[in-house]
C-alpha cells in the first residue's frame, strides 16, 4: 500500500516591506491571513521573528563549534527563505498500519528547523544504528533538526536529521519553523550551488505543482 499522509497546514513566510529583486519568487510571496481572527497576524509574526532570532543564535554556536569565521552562516539571512508552518494531525479512527504516516521518513531540504509540539508523541528520528527512536518534548521545549542544505554548507560536518511522524489515535499539533538563507547564498563554492535554486530543485523533484 502507498504511504498515507494525513494533516492540515497553515503556512506563512517573511513579511517583506521593501522592494527587492526576490519579491516575486515563491519563497517571498505575500502572506494571506484569515480576516476573522483578531490579532492572528500580529501574534504569528511576533513568534516568527522570535524563531528567526533563536535560529541565528544556534547558527552562531555552530560557527564556533566548527571553528568557522564569525558570520560564516549568520550574515546570510538578511532576507531569509524562512517558513513557519502550523500542522494539525487528526486522530485516526481505523487500525493503524506500518505505512500510516503523518509524514513519511525524510530529511528536511533546508538549513535548520525548529520544532514546537503539544507534547503528543508521534515524532521519531533515525539513529546512526538505523534504529528509529521516539522523540518526546514538553510544550516549552524546542526540537532542532538539521537539514540537507546545512549538511552541504558545512561540508558534511553537520548531518541532516532523518525523521518521520507516526500516525496515532490522538490528535497532534506541531509548529515547525524552517530557516533557510537568502535566495542567492552560495552554499557550495565548488559546485557554485545557490540556496534558492537548490531548494527549488528539491521541491520540483518531490511535488507536482498544480493550479486548481
Indicate where each model-derived feature is located.
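Catalytic core of Fe(II)/2-oxoglutarate
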Residues: 72-73, 82, 87-88, 98-100, ...
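Short, small-residue-biased leader/transition segments that mark boundaries at the very start
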Residues: 1-5
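N-proximal short alpha-helices
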Residues: 24-31, 35, 185
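Glycine-rich active-site/cofactor-binding loop and its immediate structural neighborhood
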Residues: 8, 21-24
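Conserved double-stranded beta-helix
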Residues: 9, 15-18, 31-38, 43-124, ...
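Solvent-exposed, charged interface segments at domain starts and junctions
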Residues: 22, 38-45, 169, 212
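Active-site-adjacent structural patch at catalytic or cofactor/ligand-binding sites
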Residues: 12, 25-29, 108, 143-144
Amino acid at each position: 500500500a502507498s504511504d498515507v499522509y494525513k494533516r492540515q497546514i497553515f503556512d506563512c513566510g517573511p513579511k517583506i516591506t521593501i522592494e527587492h529583486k526576490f519579491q516575486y519568487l515563491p519563497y517571498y510571496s505575500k502572506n494571506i491571513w484569515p480576516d476573522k481572527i483578531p490579532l492572528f497576524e500580529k501574534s504569528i509574526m511576533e513568534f516568527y521573528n522570535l524563531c528567526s532570532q533563536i535560529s541565528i543564535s544556534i547558527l552562531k554556536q555552530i560557527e564556533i563549534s566548527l571553528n568557522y569565521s564569525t558570520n560564516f552562516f549568520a550574515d546570510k539571512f538578511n532576507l531569509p527563505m524562512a517558513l513557519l508552518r502550523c500542522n494539525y494531525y487528526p486522530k485516526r479512527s481505523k487500525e493503524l498500519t506500518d505505512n500510516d504516516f503523518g509524514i513519511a521518513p525524510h530529511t528536511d531540504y533546508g538549513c535548520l528547523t525548529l520544532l514546537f509540539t503539544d507534547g503528543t508523541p508521534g515524532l521519531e528520528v533515525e539513529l546512526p544504528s538505523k534504529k528509529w527512536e521516539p522523540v518526546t518534548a514538553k510544550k516549552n521545549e524546542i526540537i532542532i533538526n538539521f537539514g540537507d542544505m546545512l549538511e552541504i554548507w558545512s561540508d558534511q560536518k553537520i548531518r541532516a536529521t532523518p525523521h518521520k511522524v507516526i500516525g496515532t489515535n490522538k490528535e497532534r499539533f506541531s509548529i515547525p519553523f524552517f530557516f533557510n538563507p537568502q535566495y542567492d547564498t552560495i552554499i557550495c563554492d565548488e559546485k557554485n550551488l545557490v540556496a534558492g535554486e537548490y531548494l527549488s530543485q528539491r521541491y520540483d523533484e518531490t511535488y507536482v505543482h498544480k493550479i486548481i
